[in-house]
From Swiss-Prot:
InterPro entries: FH2_Formin, FH2_Formin_sf, Formin-like_plant. It is found in: Membrane. The gene is FH9. Residues 464-884 form the FH2 domain. The chain crosses the membrane at residues 140-160. This is Formin-like protein 9. Residues 1-19 form the signal peptide. One of its GO terms (molecular function) is actin filament binding. Keywords: Membrane, Signal, Transmembrane, Transmembrane helix.
Amino acid sequence: MGMAMRCVLVLFSVSPVLLLFNFEMLEVALHLASREKELDTAAVTPSASLSFLSRFRIMLGMNHHRSRGRRHKRCSEAPAPAPAPALVPAHQARSEAPAPLVHVPRKGMPSTHRSHIAPARSPVHKVKDGGHTKIPRSAIVALGVVGLCLVVLGVVIAAFSVRRSRKFKKVCTKAFKPFHHGSRDQRSPAATRKVSSHPSPDPLTLSSIVQYQQNLPNLKQSSESKSLSIQSTIPMGTELIVSDHAVINNSQSDEVESFHSIPCSDLSAGSITELPQQICDRRAIMNRSEYFLQTHDSPSDSSYQSLSPDCTSRLSPKDQTFTASSHLSLRSKTCPEKSDGENAEINCHDGLEITCISGSMEHKEAPIEERARINFRNPPSQHIFPPSYRTDTSQSKINIAFTMTNSEVESSSKESSRIETSSSMGIPKPAPPPPPQKNPPPNLKGQCYGQPPPPPPLPLQIQVGKDGSPLPRLKPLHWDKVRAAPNRSMVWNDIRSSSFEFEFDEQMIKSLFAYNLQGSMKDEEAMNKTASTTKHVIEHHRLQNTTILLKTLNANTSQVCNSVIQGNGLSVQQLEALVKMKPTKEEEEKLLNYDGDINMLDPAENFVKVLLTIPMAFPRMEVMLYKENFDDEVAHIKMSFAMIEGACTELKSSKLFLRLLEAVLKTGNRMNVGTLRGGASAFKLDALLKLADIRGTDGKTTLLHFVVKEMARSKGLKALEKLNETPSSCHDTPTEREEYSSMGTEFVSELSNELGNVKKVASIDLDTLRNSISNLSCGLAQLRNLVEKDLASDDKNNNFLQCMKSFLNHAENTMQGLKADEAQVLLNVRELTEYYHGEVSKDESNLLQIFIIVKDFLGLLDKVCREMRGTKHNQTLNLVLPLK
């Protein structure tokens, strides 16, 4: 007996106790009510306690002792005559009822002279306020408690039923797991069994799925083994095909098995084992049968199919196998349930045959074309019903497809089907299933999900040239395509493919922009093959850089070696790449001392090792690079010196700049009147940059604007005097002053053109210029040492020495003149700085700072001149427009 059944029995036993407890509470309540109100004692029985039957009748309201007349209910009750006192024994004194009380009528109610004895009332009814009777509140509470107990008991029974059904479903799910994990190859022919039942008006459905238990002796069944032989005959107009479906697991949702139908007519009689528990849900069967009768459309899902007898004859026992540890019991809608646990039998009356799988069964899966075929014995009247019964759990699904004919099936309510089972002692255990397949075949996937397999990918379109050969892939040109606008005229509409007269040189475009896929693949394969056999001497990062530089040479090893020996024949870019390949002293020693196979080294290391065989190879390359860059470096330095000298000359000889300084000096002294800064005779040029920071009261005009206007007016006045040859008056009108300033603004703006070299010199870094001269001197010293000391005068080095000695003489003379020019330029810059700033300390880092100041001031001056010209132009327009 299970734990749940024990709990139910305990509840059943506790319920009477609760009822008795409620009866006791009811008795106490009635006793208290009788004492409080002191009702009529005549209605009370001589005994103070009520019997059990009376209490139960009172609780259910069955004890009604009401008077036959309703007139006593509303009328006032007259007191009953008191009996004559009598002597009673002492032991009966307590049991006697007290004397009746005199009834006091209500106020405002007419008194009646009628007096009679009130009828005796039940102790359940209370006399309250005019004779109205009500059930006591304690009785209502007791009845509510009893009802609540009954409701709780019903809920517990319902929960137990639901729990038992869920547990049964879980057991069925576990029982079908071997169908999922097993394969179809493990089925045995002896596992097929046939069950015949009398057909009913409704289609036959799968009514129950029960668990097979191995410990059959523990069940309430007979230990006697019986064999059941079921013979069936199939009517001519009826054929039932049951298809088995593979169970789908959640973890392997895509592993779907196809269905196979096995006709019942080709199977022989077998034995069926009794299942320990059988449940027949008649309501579910009726609903499913109604769904089958209402649904006549062919199933759209291709996961279940029926095979004809022709197809089943082609099955072989070497195909997929299902292994199960549970048995399926198929019943009709009218199968009765047996509560006494006896064995049941299914009597076959009309020969309807069903094939069940118990244990393992082997059959061969037919091809797709054959599985799609269905044999109909009565084509005009048959219907194919979709699967309606589906045990929907997280681990298993079972679909059953039925093929029915038009022949009516006679039903009989008197007939009953029973399954008589016996436990055979020699039941062989099925073999362990093989591991499940991870991916089903592609044809099964398409069948299970009801959709055709995906089409194969389209082949890439290969472009073909004029000769019919495929065009190679070139490096792409990344651009954004423009969509054609049908409602708009575009320039691209006039361009046609045939309008391009120029024909591509296919060979040239292949050689320039084709992907060298084969070459790169060969190089990668060669690198992979030699990766394990090569020995690296140079550090990995430096080796990568050397490999990259080696590709930029565009020359083989012999050409490079000959050029290094001769001292010429290499460009500046090649010499720069070779100089960067120079190894460290340790790497040079390792390469020179390497005695192994030279092919074992990396190609870059091999190249460097060959170069090291030339005496002083890398010093040669360095002096060769120095020779190639010497003339360019000297020309750049001399040009810089020339610009510096020109800037010094311009600043010293510019009269306009001198007039500007004069105007600034006078204006500054006027601004600094009354301060320590007033009365200055000179100022540093960096004060010119501060003129734009001092603004007037209007917020627009700066001190630089004022200085420029005064200079322009002065220049314009002088120019006008030269043209008219008349002296200027001291009192000029504002209009005349504007004319003078407009004429003089052009002269002031010319200062930027006069000091053109000053702007160029401002971009020169004197420290960089000095470093360039120092590098040339160091390279010349290295060349002198190489020619005079390092290289011996032999036949191999003769050409190199002659070439370098001639260059050495030229370089020495050039460097001497370059150093003299450097000294002269620096002297001129110092003199210019002293000319404007006075004495300059020798520790001043940048002597060219004066040129930077003048350049910035010229930029401010040009901006002010443009603003002044624009303002005058706007004023002219404002004067002309009103006249129109």
